[in-house]
Amino acid sequence: KCKKNSISFVQLLSPTTSISRMKKIINSSHEMIYYISMLSTTGGKLKGSPREILKNYNKIKKIIKKRKKNLVIGFGITSKNISSFKSSDGCVVGSEICKKISKSIKNRQNPVTNVNNMLRKLKSKIL
């Protein structure tokens, strides 16, 4: 139904996804797959080193490469560690954005301007 309505369905992979399930997800996914870097709730602190996360990411990327799909990393990605993930197809920083919005509102600042500035800084760390 998603493709029929021009909606991209983003599926998730995690460190505990089995190879057989992973292949099914990769085959049925659209242009992008979200790799949940760790078992945690959103906004959690990074568990394990970026090197360990990228090791798992690269294993998945080898499987995906043949299908030309993007693999983005999320969970635990912050302004402090984002440059470690330069080699990924993309990084999800949802909790960082939510924190910036909350802080902006609390300080009676423009959240759109502050989020935009934060994203520019993050972009400069990975490009």
Predicted regions and their residues:
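Extended, intrinsically disordered, low-complexity segments
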Residues: 16, 114-127
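Active-site-adjacent beta->alpha loops and helix N-cap segments on the catalytic face
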Residues: 1-4, 18-23, 42-59, 80-83, ...
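Glycine-rich phosphate-binding active-site loops on the catalytic face of alpha/beta enzymes
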Residues: 34-44, 87-107
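Active-site beta-loop-alpha junctions enriched in small/polar residues
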Residues: 12-16, 38-39, 74-80, 96-98
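Short beta-strand/loop segments at the ligand-binding rim of alpha/beta enzyme cores
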Residues: 2-12, 60-76
